[in-house]
Structure formats: C-alpha cells, structure tokens
Regions:
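Compositionally biased, proline/threonine/alanine/serine-rich low-complexity intrinsically disordered stretches
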Residues: 1-54
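Short beta-strand-centered segments at strand-helix junctions
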Residues: 167-181
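Gly/Pro-biased beta-strand-loop elements
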Residues: 43-158, 179-186
Length: 193
C-alpha cells in the first residue's frame, strides 16, 4: 500500500499510531468574577400559568381590545371567534392598584424612564432619569395609557410576573411585551378590572 490516509488510519505499513490523550487531574484554579460581572442572585422561573397562550374568550369586548385582570394577573388580547391571547403580568402593589378604561396613546421601543415626583418621594435612591436599554425598568417596549402615568411595559425583572409589585403599571416579560406591541396600535381600548 502507498502510505495513504487509510493506511495511516488503520495501521498499514509505515503508519504511526497516535497516543491516547492524557488528562490532567489537577484542580482548576478558582477565579473571582471580573469587576462589574459579579454573580447575580438566582430567581425562580416564571410559572407556566403566566406564559403566553391562546385561550377561549366569552366576554363582550371587541377583537383588538386588551383586558387586564389584576386579580388573576393576566392580560388578554381579544381576538376573533371567541379566542384571546393571554399573557402573564405584574400589577400594582397594594395601594397602587387601579381599574378603569383607557386607550393606548403612545408606543415606544426601549423607552427612557423618568420616575414621577411621587415615586421619587417614596424612593429617593432612584435615578432621576434612565435611558432606554436592558437595565431600564420599562424593558423593551412601553404602551402609554391615556394621559396617566400608567403604562403596559416590559421588565428587566421577569421573575416579578404574576405578582403585585409595581406602582400601578402593568409589567410583562420583554418577549411578551414585544409580541403584544406588534399586535396593538395607538387607540387600542384597554380595560383594567
């Protein structure tokens, strides 16, 4: 044989057998995280109950309407033929919950956040302004409700979905708020119960 690939592979004349690799058993040194990349606390996963899903709808609202049930912590986008898309949400904590009917008056991608004066009085540690981005508490999208300070927005704290934690805004997982944002328009009716 001519010393080709098969001979090398299967041990023909002139072949050289490779030695099996050796593995070191020395312990791997422990390193500290780089500055600014400290380990973050683990948070529980979002309950499957609060994941986006298609459900039946038997109410009286027209297709395209948003219904937010603050007790269930669920938002419904009413669709045709007795169907709805359901999303889990975080809602206002005790003393900050509200109900009523509004319209979406603005939509913003990666919105800036300026805490209102009332919030700054309660939380003077908050920044006075924060540019949009992954650290911004409004998340990836925001839909503004009427002339109020309330919004339906994303969150950089997805583990809070299904809880009463906000100052009255309706928060969603970022992937869900992006999905909803694409499905609604300015003028959409929002019913909060």
């Amino acid at each position: 044989m001519g010393g080709g690939f098969l001979e090398q592979l299967f041990g023909g004349p002139g072949s050289q057998q490779a030695a099996p690799p050796s593995y070191a058993t020395a312990p791997i040194p422990q390193y500290e995280p780089a500055p600014g990349y400290e380990a973050q606390p683990a948070h529980p996963a979002v309950s499957p109950r609060f994941m986006k899903q298609k459900v039946s709808y038997e109410g009286n609202e027209r297709p395209g309407t948003l219904i937010i049930n603050t007790q269930e912590r669920l938002l419904y986008l009413v669709q045709e033929n007795g169907r709805a898309i359901r999303y889990g949400v975080g809602v206002g904590k005790p003393g900050f919950a509200w109900a009523g009917t509004r319209q979406i008056t603005q939509k913003r991608e990666w919105p800036d956040w300026t805490p209102p004066d009332e919030m700054l009085k309660r939380r003077p540690d908050l920044p006075r302004h924060m540019a949009g981005g992954i650290d911004n508490p409004l998340g990836a999208r925001a839909m503004y409700l009427g002339s109020s300070l309330y919004r339906i927005h994303g969150s950089n704290e997805p583990w809070t979905i299904g809880t009463a934690v906000s100052s009255g805004c309706i928060r969603m997982r970022n992937e869900d708020v992006i999905d909803l944002y694409e499905k609604v328009k300015v003028g959409t009716k929002v019913v909060v119960i």
